[in-house]
């Protein structure tokens, strides 16, 4: 499985700022947006292009354009929505597919409660957006959903990832590429990433308990 930990100095600087527990909701949200743009830039570096001839100021000119159907972004509710503006700033023509999952309290497995996917997934690159890759359960369920709908080229973009989640993903979907700003140490007994970011959804939307 292709796992890319983006070591660009700007990415590392910004993920360090995100780890500050005293950071305001506004500051956290802005950094998530910025990191979404930077990580999406890395994740789209190997998109296929095709030649196209268009009018230029001095006559016809041959240029490169992204081949195939437009990319679809797949934010996982709710925290994934925080990354969406930054990625759309880079890829404004992208389609957006939205997925929501919640944990079944008896089986502890993720269960979809919302699914709105764009069409022609078999022709598109799908970029899953989620700040945290922890156990991998939600991500794996999302990939299962996308593949059932026809998606064949899937990448995941995360701010931080846990080794346990990466291992779980590789066991069932080794074809999926992962891009992250940081691979953290481990999960604690409650499934939180350490050192992590805390609850990214609460910090993005300002719903954490003060």
From Swiss-Prot:
SUPFAM superfamilies hit by this protein: PRTase-like
Q: CDD domains of this UniProt entry? A: PRTases_typeI
Q: Which UniProt keywords apply?
A: Allosteric enzyme, Glycosyltransferase, GTP-binding, Magnesium, Nucleotide-binding, Transferase
This protein's record includes keyword Cell membrane: no
Q: In which pathway does it act?
A: Pyrimidine metabolism; UMP biosynthesis via salvage pathway; UMP from uracil: step 1/1
Instruction: Mention one GO molecular function.
Output: uracil phosphoribosyltransferase activity
Activity control, as annotated, is: Allosterically activated by GTP.
Does the keyword field hold Glycosyltransferase? Answer: yes
Q: Which InterPro entries match?
A: PRibTrfase_dom (IPR000836), PRTase-like (IPR029057), Upp_B (IPR034332), UPRTase/APRTase (IPR050054), Ura_phspho_trans (IPR005765)
* Top-rank EC class of the record's enzyme: transferase
Q: Give the cofactors, semicolon-separated.
A: Mg(2+)
Organism superkingdom: Bacteria
What's the stated role of this polypeptide? Answer: Catalyzes the conversion of uracil and 5-phospho-alpha-D-ribose 1-diphosphate (PRPP) to UMP and diphosphate.
Q: What is this protein called?
A: Uracil phosphoribosyltransferase
Task: Tell me the organism.
Answer: Xanthomonas oryzae pv. oryzae (strain MAFF 311018)
Q: What is the lineage of its organism?
A: Bacteria, Pseudomonadati, Pseudomonadota, Gammaproteobacteria, Lysobacterales
């Amino acid at each position: 499985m292709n796992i890319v930990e983006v070591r660009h100095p700007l990415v590392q600087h910004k993920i360090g700022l995100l780890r500050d527990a005293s950071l305001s909701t506004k500051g956290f949200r802005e950094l998530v947006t910025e990191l979404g743009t930077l990580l999406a830039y890395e994740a789209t570096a190997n998109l296929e292009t095709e030649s196209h001839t268009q009018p230029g100021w001095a006559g016809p000119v041959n240029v490169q354009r992204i081949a195939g159907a437009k990319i679809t972004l797949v934010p996982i509710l709710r925290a994934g929505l925080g990354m969406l503006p930054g990625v759309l700033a880079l890829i404004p023509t992208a389609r957006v597919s939205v997925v929501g999952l919640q944990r079944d309290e008896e089986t502890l497995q993720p269960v979809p409660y919302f699914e709105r996917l764009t069409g022609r997934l078999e022709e598109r690159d799908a970029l899953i957006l989620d700040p945290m890759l922890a156990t991998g359960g939600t991500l794996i369920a999302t990939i299962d959903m996308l593949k059932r709908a026809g998606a064949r080229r899937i990448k995941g973009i995360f701010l931080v990832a846990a080794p346990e989640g990466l291992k779980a993903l590789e066991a069932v979907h080794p074809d999926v590429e992962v891009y992250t700003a940081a691979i953290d140490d481990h999960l604690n007994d409650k499934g939180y990433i350490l050192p992590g970011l805390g609850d990214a959804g609460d910090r993005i939307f300002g719903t954490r308990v003060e």
